């Protein structure tokens, strides 16, 4: 009985640590869209910009791209570290990295300073996802995985919504944005909790006893190459859709209101975040219910339709805009409840953190190209909506690719 209680306590500690780690990731991701406009406008004279909209759009795209590339390299590096040294120690270091370097954004004087610091912060964020997912999926029984996948996926969007609520009550200006970044250093305390209280994965311990893994080589080896490349493609499609369009919704809201409604950005971000929490919870259950492949196909189809309605059919800030923001935020985020369920099922324990990290975060590199493209499209079209309408066509590709992947519903995690 004592052993069972200890196991249950360990499972809950793992879940809480992974949830908080990914929630704070979402908070860190939500910070920049909230502060981007005042921060970049403050820095514009140092660079010599003349058009605020074009300057903000261009640098928003560049900094978002750097963020995504940093997350990709972080996912690879910390995933490798998690397979070699253990999930817990690697996750502690990842949380510490993103907390400290978010806080250091306080000292940025030029846009490239922000870009460099966001790159390193993202390095830590990219690692936390793959490590947290591996820990949870290895600690809990198979029957709980669809629900827990949704819970973990929703965590980032809880953080995203929380930072938006802050923006609703605390006006972010050219004088105050730096203090928002300082608040982003708070998750450093979580790193200490992880190191002191969270138990290491028993599956990883058993796998480590069997010999030294070569995780990077193996995930790109003949046995796993197809799974790895398909997982990268699936992550890329979802991430391009999110970072190339949905992340720009607060800026679009600000543009639609002409800057006369300071709360418009925060309300947009809150509704998108709340929709995303619901979507993530349902995404894992959706995949667990009808199967991994039909679920991904359905999410791509719904995302394609709803994004088309939002970006092509809505032309002013109001009730219709806010309803569509909620729906688009939900369906495009449901992928992030599906990924924690499906990606662990594609890789054995000895390389699971690396495989997930490579797949999900290599997708971020391609999403970085999407963010850069979005920035250029905003300049070209002079419209966030037209740019978003083009980028979100990427979901059509996912509707075909998913049928090349294995169906894993009802199968245990590979050892």
PLM feature spans:
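Cytosolic juxtamembrane N-terminal segment immediately preceding the first transmembrane helix
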Residues: 1-34
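Extracytoplasmic gate region of multi-pass secondary transporters
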Residues: 33-34, 224-277, 367, 371
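Extracellular/periplasmic helix-loop-helix junction of adjacent transmembrane segments
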Residues: 36-73
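Conserved MFS/SLC helix-loop-helix module at the cytosolic interface between two early adjacent transmembrane helices
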Residues: 73-109
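Cytoplasmic membrane-interface "Motif A"-like loop-to-helix N-cap segments
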Residues: 84-95, 288-300
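Helix-breaking motifs and short loop linkers at transmembrane-helix boundaries and internal kinks
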Residues: 86, 107-113, 141, 291, ...
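C-terminal ends and interior cores of transmembrane alpha-helices
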Residues: 96-109, 301-316
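Glycine-rich segments within core transmembrane alpha-helices of 12-TM secondary carriers
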Residues: 144-172, 187, 360-371
């Amino acid at each position: 009985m004592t052993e069972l209680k200890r196991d249950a306590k360990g499972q809950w500690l793992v879940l809480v640590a992974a949830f908080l780690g990914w929630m704070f990731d979402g908070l860190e991701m939500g910070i920049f869209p909230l502060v981007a406009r005042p921060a970049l406008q403050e820095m514009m004279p140092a660079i010599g910009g003349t058009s605020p909209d074009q300057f903000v759009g261009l640098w928003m795209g560049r900094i978002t791209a750097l963020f995504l590339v940093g997350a990709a390299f972080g996912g690879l590096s910390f995933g490798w570290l998690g397979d070699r040294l253990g999930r817990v120690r690697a996750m502690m270091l990842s949380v510490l990295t993103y907390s400290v370097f978010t806080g250091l954004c306080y000292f940025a004087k030029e846009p490239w300073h922000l870009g460099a610091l966001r790159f390193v912060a993202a390095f830590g964020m990219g690692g936390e996802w793959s490590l947290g997912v591996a820990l949870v999926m290895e600690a809990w029984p198979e029957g709980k995985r669809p629900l827990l996948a949704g819970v973990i996926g929703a965590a980032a969007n809880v953080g995203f919504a929380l930072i938006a609520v802050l923006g609703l009550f605390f006006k972010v200006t050219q004088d105050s944005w730096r203090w928002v970044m300082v608040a982003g250093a708070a998750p450093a305390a979580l790193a200490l909790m992880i190191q002191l209280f969270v138990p290491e994965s028993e599956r990883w311990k058993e796998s480590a006893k069997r010999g030294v893994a070569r995780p990077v080589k193996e995930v790109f080896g003949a046995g796993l190459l197809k799974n790895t490349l398909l997982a990268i493609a699936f992550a890329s499609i979802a991430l391009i859709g999110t970072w190339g369009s949905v992340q720009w919704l607060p800026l679009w809201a600000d543009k639609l209101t002409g800057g006369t409604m300071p709360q418009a950005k925060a309300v947009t971000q809150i509704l998108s975040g709340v929709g995303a929490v619901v979507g993530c919870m349902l995404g894992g259950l959706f995949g667990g219910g009808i199967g991994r492949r039909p679920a991904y196909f359905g999410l791509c189809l719904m995302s394609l339709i709803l994004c088309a309605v939002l970006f092509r059919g809505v032309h002013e800030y109001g009730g219709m805009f806010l309803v569509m923001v909620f729906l688009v935020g939900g369906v495009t985020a449901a992928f992030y409840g599906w990924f924690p369920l499906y990606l662990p099922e594609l890789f054995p324990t000895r390389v699971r953190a690396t495989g997930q990290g490579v797949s999900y975060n290599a997708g971020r590199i391609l999403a970085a190209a999407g963010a850069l493209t979005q920035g250029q499209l905003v300049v070209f079209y002079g419209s966030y909506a037209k740019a978003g309408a083009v980028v979100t066509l990427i979901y059509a590709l996912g509707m075909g690719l998913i049928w090349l992947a294995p169906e894993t519903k009802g199968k245990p995690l590979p050892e």
